[in-house]
């Protein structure tokens, strides 16, 4: 297996313009494909997940052109539901941001489509979404294991009264919200359980509004969507920087700044993960906000005990930042780590112990006490981009760290290690 050893880093300083947000990129691509008119998307993320979405749209007859660096996409909308040219199988890798929204959107009208992906995708639950789509008339079969992909979709979704479980993934609700305006009937969606990652629903609602569709949101417990609507292209749309990707650089500034400035997100960003900067501030770093930047300056870091339900992806970065904080850090209400690219709670606990931390892994929390001195270890990444990027921070100590399968960052940030090296002064 390929590996990358990062030598100790004495200081991190400078600025980075972030690659486009994965969450925003794939939502914007799907809405542009469903919309009337031509949309020009700029600062699109070039990553595995986005390529899977683009390949799927292409197979569904959507025409688009990409710039040489794949960050600009000119896409001609279908002016309504996507139509398969015949029976079709779409391979979506391990891209939840493609699988969940497409599973819903392709239930409009009459299609015969199989959605499948990598072995890990077949372990990521989708039953709550399928249950909700069936309530709206969708005809869906599980081809292997009940409640998991691959799925066969045969259209039939018409809207109506729908319940969705919000406790596992907000992507299920996102998928229903984006599809419902194109259904022939009005749709009322009721959320059961505590809605996880609520800020990701705000991204969805924000983008739908950009494409001309507004819905009634009753305290995130009930959403009322008029049927028979159309999305309309906004013309040009700039994809903001990825706030989850910003977390590694901001944390590096907190631990070994200097000052690190990330551009492409700021106080006006729609992504909930910008709140990660508030957590660093609580730990002792100094944060400066602009409209399109966030800067972080080193401080003496102290442990925290916090509910992280609102920023589950960026919260992973706090788990490795905790190695540099005084005291025991507890991250709570993070059960949905277990249904991401890997079981992130298990993976994080396992790898933190390798570098010497004392770790308590609970059903939905993790408690981390740093060692006096970090140990050099080979870090398993579990084909999970965020594991690789989180554990790069170990090099901000006087100990090297070896990252196994470093190329897994291609899911959201293909040149992550080059960018980190560019801003780092070796010890």
From Swiss-Prot:
One of its GO terms (molecular function) is 3-phosphoshikimate 1-carboxyvinyltransferase activity. Catalyzes the transfer of the enolpyruvyl moiety of phosphoenolpyruvate (PEP) to the 5-hydroxyl of shikimate-3-phosphate (S3P) to produce enolpyruvyl shikimate-3-phosphate and inorganic phosphate. One of its GO terms (biological process) is aromatic amino acid family biosynthetic process. Belongs to the EPSP synthase family. Pfam families: EPSP_synthase (PF00275). GO terms for cellular component: cytoplasm. Keywords: Amino-acid biosynthesis, Aromatic amino acid biosynthesis, Cytoplasm, Transferase. The lineage of its organism: Bacteria, Pseudomonadati, Pseudomonadota, Gammaproteobacteria, Enterobacterales. It is an enzyme of class 2 (transferase). It comes from the Bacteria. InterPro entries: Enolpyruvate_Tfrase_dom (IPR001986), Enolpyruvate_Tfrase_sf (IPR036968), EPSP_synthase (IPR006264), EPSP_synthase_CS (IPR023193), RNA3'P_cycl/enolpyr_Trfase_a/b (IPR013792). It comes from Salmonella schwarzengrund (strain CVM19633). It is found in: Cytoplasm. This is 3-phosphoshikimate 1-carboxyvinyltransferase. PROSITE patterns: EPSP_SYNTHASE_1, EPSP_SYNTHASE_2. PANTHER family: AROM/DEHYDROQUINATE SYNTHASE, PENTAFUNCTIONAL AROM POLYPEPTIDE. 3-phosphoshikimate binds at residues 22-23, 27, 169-171, 197, 313, 336, 340. Phosphoenolpyruvate binds at residues 22, 96, 124, 171, 344, 386, 411. The active site is at residue 313. Its EC number is 2.5.1.19. It catalyses: 3-phosphoshikimate + phosphoenolpyruvate = 5-O-(1-carboxyvinyl)-3-phosphoshikimate + phosphate. The gene is aroA. Pathway: Metabolic intermediate biosynthesis; chorismate biosynthesis; chorismate from D-erythrose 4-phosphate and phosphoenolpyruvate: step 6/7. Monomer.
């Amino acid at each position: 297996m390929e590996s990358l050893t990062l030598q100790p880093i004495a200081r991190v300083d400078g600025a980075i313009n972030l690659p486009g947000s994965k969450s925003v990129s794939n939502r914007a691509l799907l809405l542009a494909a469903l919309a009337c008119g031509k949309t020009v998307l700029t600062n699109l993320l070039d990553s595995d997940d986005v390529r899977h979405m683009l390949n799927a749209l292409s197979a569904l007859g959507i025409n688009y052109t990409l710039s040489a660096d794949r960050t600009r996409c000119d896409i001609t909308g279908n002016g309504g539901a996507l139509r398969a040219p015949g029976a079709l199988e779409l391979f979506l890798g391990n891209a939840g941001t493609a699988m969940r929204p497409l599973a819903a959107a392709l239930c409009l009208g009459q299609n015969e489509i199989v959605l499948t992906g990598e072995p890990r995708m077949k372990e990521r639950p989708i039953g709550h979404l399928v249950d909700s789509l069936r309530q709206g008339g969708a005809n869906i079969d599980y081809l292997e294991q009940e409640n998991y992909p691959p799925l066969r979709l045969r259209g039939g979704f018409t809207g109506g009264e729908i319940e969705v479980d919000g406790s596992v993934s907000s992507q299920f609700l996102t998928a229903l919200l984006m599809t419902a305006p194109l259904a022939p009937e009005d749709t009322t969606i009721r959320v059961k359980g505590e809605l996880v990652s609520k800020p990701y629903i705000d991204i969805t609602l924000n983008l739908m509004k950009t494409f001309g569709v507004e819905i009634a949101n009753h305290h995130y417990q009930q959403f009322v969507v008029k049927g028979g609507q159309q999305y309309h292209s906004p013309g040009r749309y700039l994809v903001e920087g990825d706030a989850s990707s910003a977390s590694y650089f901001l944390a590096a500034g907190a631990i070994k700044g200097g000052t690190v400035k990330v551009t492409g997100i700021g106080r006006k960003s729609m992504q909930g993960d910008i709140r990660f900067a508030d957590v660093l501030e609580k730990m002792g770093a100094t944060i400066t906000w602009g409209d399109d930047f966030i800067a972080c300056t080193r401080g003496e870091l102290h442990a925290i005990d916090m509910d992280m339900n609102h920023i589950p992806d960026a919260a992973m970065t706090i788990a490795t930042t905790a190695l540099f904080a005084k005291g025991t850090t507890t991250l709570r209400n993070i059960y949905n780590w277990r249904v991401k690219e890997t079981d992130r709670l298990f993976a994080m606990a396992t790898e933190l112990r390798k570098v010497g931390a004392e770790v308590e892994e609970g059903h939905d929390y993790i408690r981390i006490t740093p060692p006096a001195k970090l140990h050099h270890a080979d870090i398993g990444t579990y084909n999970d981009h965020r594991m690789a990027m989180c554990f790069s921070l170990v090099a901000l100590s006087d100990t090297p760290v070896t990252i196994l399968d470093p190329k897994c960052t291609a899911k959201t940030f293909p040149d992550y290690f080059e960018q980190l090296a560019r801003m780092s002064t070796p010890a």
